[in-house]
Amino acid sequence: MELNGSPQKPKRKHSGDPHSLPSAKHLRPDSAAPSSPRISGDQTSGDLAVYGYRNVDSADAAAMQMKLPAVQTDSAEWQETIETVVKSVVSIHFCQTASFDTDLSMSSQATGFVVDAKRGYILTNRHVVCAGPFWGYCIFDNHEECDVTPIYRDPVHDFGILKFDPKAIKYMPLTELKLQPESARVGVEIRVVGNDAGEKLSILSGVISRLDRNAPEYGEGYSDFNTNYIQAAAAASGGSSGSPVVNIDGHVIALQAGGRADGAATDYFLPLDRPLRALQCIQKGELVSRGTIQTQWIIKPFDECRRLGLSPEWEAEVRRVAPKETGMLVAEIVLPEGPGDGKLQEGDVLIKANGELLTQFVRLDDILDSSVGGDVHLLVQRGGEDLEVTCKVQDLHAITPSRYVTVAGATFHDLSYQQARLYAIACKGVYVCEAAGSFKLESTFSGWIIDSVDKRPTRNLDEFIEVLKTIPDRARIVLSYRHIRDLHTRGTSIVHIDRHWHPHMRLAQRNDQTGLWDFTDLADPIPAEPPVPRKADFIQLDGVSHPAAADIVRSFVRVSCTMPVKLDGFPQARKTGFGLVVDAEKGLVVISRAIVPFDLCDINITVADSIIVSAKVVFLHPLQNYTIIQYDPSLVQAPVKTARLSPEYIKQGAETLFVGFNQNFRIVVAKTAVTDITTVAIPPNAAAPRYRAINLDAITVDTGLSSQCTSGVLLGEDGVIQALWLNYLGERTQSSHKDVEYHLGLATPSLIPVISQIQSGVIPRLRILDMETYVIQMSQARVMGVSEEWIEKVAKANAARHELFMVRKVDCASPLSADVRPLEEGDIILTLNDKLITRVSEFDMMYDQETLDALIVRNGEEMKIKIKTVPTEDLETDRALIFCGAVLQKPHHAVRQQISKLHSEVYVSARSRGSPAYQYGLSPTNFITAVNGVKTPDLDSFIREVSNIPNNTYFRLRAVTFDNVPWVVTMKKNDHYFPMSEYIKEPSAPLGWRTVNYDRGKERRGTGDIANLNADAMDEGRDEGVSDVEPDIE
């Protein structure tokens, strides 16, 4: 089960007693099974290990394979029992389509078994049924498949019930398994019958070793409590969550729930008393009542109870009435403001409930569940003294969230009893279960509690909704919040409310009749207030001996870019850096393209750390890693200064002044010198192509500050800027799966023609040679057939660097294009339009030429060819289709740079967690070539074909991987949670893009939400590891 990552430090430190071993939830998909025990938090004893749920995806299953003991041959009786049992066991494949409560959106698989063949009820784990929106299907033993919907998930205990249509199973008689909780006894031989990651049936044997184990704590996230667990040696493997634990009679005596993930052959099963009661209630058409006094109890052995004050008289009485008992129930957590608050205390030993001597959870549950809305009378011992208390029994369902609201890209609901219990806090407040969009707080996915919005308290979800209804689009408001792991620290942030990319405030309400979550739009966005001009002054640099450095502060602005969807393989949803003002009168700013990668985004510029104005993309350079953006200068009443750019190329060894901004966005200054100017190409990213700079001369300087600063300039003594200092997005490392950023200088002369055109009101429409080159020295050139005459000409033309350029890669043409690429890999370029090419800057002639006459050396022979340049506007993305959670677009420029053949113009750029694309394995970097056997060479033909596919229906996609491997993926369409939508670039639209929503295949234009779309929950890389969307959490 893919959840929040490796377990964090547990809230409470338990003793090493087996009653209370701490647990961790699961292994990450990218982690291997531990070879030695892994200890949670600050525990260092080597005898404790973590525990894992047994529903995982195939990657998890591969990581969690364990060495099993030698298998014994089952008796004939056992074989007959298993043959009967397996007919009722199903493999469940499911998604939680949206983050909710303790779990992020995810796709996984597990096991269940039929408990009512007539009505179509399947029993499985609660963490399979999911607290949030569920979408899934099950596969029977004969490989028949049918949809399943949740009809019950317990608020606390780890079981839930799914429903299927019995009429959908046509080729096998349906049989059900009988639940017999009373047959679970120590020494009973059992079999765990489940699926091994959905691939095949696994049958594991074991023997029950104890019945009175406390429910394991799985760290952060969902954990069962207020029940005992059954322990056995079975070594269940990945995918067996929800498996029936059967005895030799074929009766189910427990439910597989969790186990140790360190290789120890120990598993933990949920007793079936409460699942059996819930099933009987549902079969009778009754509500499953669940009561609580918001108190967690745990089993403690008698020796610990004596230390807590259990009197000898009561111990003797308990041992007399229940001679087999070895412990009693003790209050572990009493939640503030709950029914037990002020009446019970941690450490109270429970003696009686409603006059009945009580030592087991099952009777306590019985009493509470039958007393909802009434009172329960408890007798406890506290420090050796008897104490009688009366508590109101609360409805447990009432404090379990069954709705959430999505607004400004983030998801919220009332704090759940699960989270409140884990952190021993009052069960109230607004909980952020998907911190994204406007509410992306401190790079954490979830866990925030919102105390106030816009200086107004938000004590519950209803108050939160009412406050958000009054906040206009693009408003900046004060947000007060705390993280559930650190409630002592209150955070305050200014958030920018996005109601234009995400205009709808949408309420999702669980519907237990249909098994779906119903969506309601709560309020239309309030239009943004017109911006007003504001005044500000820039900071003064103290102690700087260089006047030019002090003055350049007025030419820098801070740029923040937020992207509503991941395009072009870009790994982040938000970036921040500093830009250089190159025309203060027109509001033109140059910024790294690693900060503003494309124009489907929100850009905000902060001037003088005071004035915030929006900006738009004017120009994206296809090769040299810079973007030109523009803001409205009439809104800025500050002494912004136009930076002066040098028309001369800076030389190696030249002294210069480095002015940059470090990671804290503080300006730093150092006198330095240029150490090297070399032609570079940023390494390509193997996992997923994304924009990178190629064919440019990069400048490096002799100061350690250069590696710490992502933005800045190289400045002459006269205040003229000689080079921009930019960050360049590079490859993702194989080991850490983190993106590499390079910090290099870019000389200013190449910028000046582009800026001049923009200043004159003309957007540059550059044409480029669609190739990547690299430098070769004369020794290599001579071997490859360059004549001595040309070698001499090179030496005269470029005395500083004797080099020529060889074609490393020719960009791939569109499959719909008839263009022929005259250049080939390995060609050495001598001249273009009769000009010898020995510097990267000399390629700039291509920008305004449709064709170039080239003299090249190919296979040792000189030849003349005509090269047609490519218009760069064709290389930028102008359309993105969201289908079944996948982002589809034309192959962007970086794809064409890295691939040798484009298989279609339908390219998978990213996909969302918990979506059909994720569940069925449609991976980023795949090309889709056909739908149901009909070729779809472009997005229009793809839309036509998929629009004809009914909802909840399987269809076939023919795809080709980035490595040219064709394959077929079968997917099921889900329009309820993942309707088809589209972004289309339209300069006349207010945002520069318009949105198209498809309702049952019919186009509806507007600016509506792209439903269930969250850039922070998107994965843009192939399945080789974790992306920046889900960074490693240590």
Curated annotation (Swiss-Prot):
Annotated region (Serine protease), positions in chain: 89-273
GO molecular function list: serine-type endopeptidase activity
Species name: Coccidioides immitis (strain RS)
Catalytic residue list: 127 (charge relay system), 158 (charge relay system), 240 (charge relay system)
Domain PDZ: 296-381, 882-963
Region (Disordered), start-end ranges: 1-44, 1004-1034
Main location: nucleus
SUPFAM superfamilies: PDZ domain-like, Trypsin-like serine proteases
GO cellular component, one term: nucleus
Repeat in keyword set: yes
Protein name: Pro-apoptotic serine protease NMA111
Protein's job: Nuclear serine protease which mediates apoptosis.
Example GO BP: proteolysis
Composition bias, Polar residues: 33-44
Domain of life: Eukaryota
Subcellular location: Nucleus
Record keywords, A-Z: Apoptosis, Hydrolase, Nucleus, Protease, Repeat, Serine protease
E.C. no: 3.4.21.-
Family assignment from sequence similarity: Belongs to the peptidase S1C family.
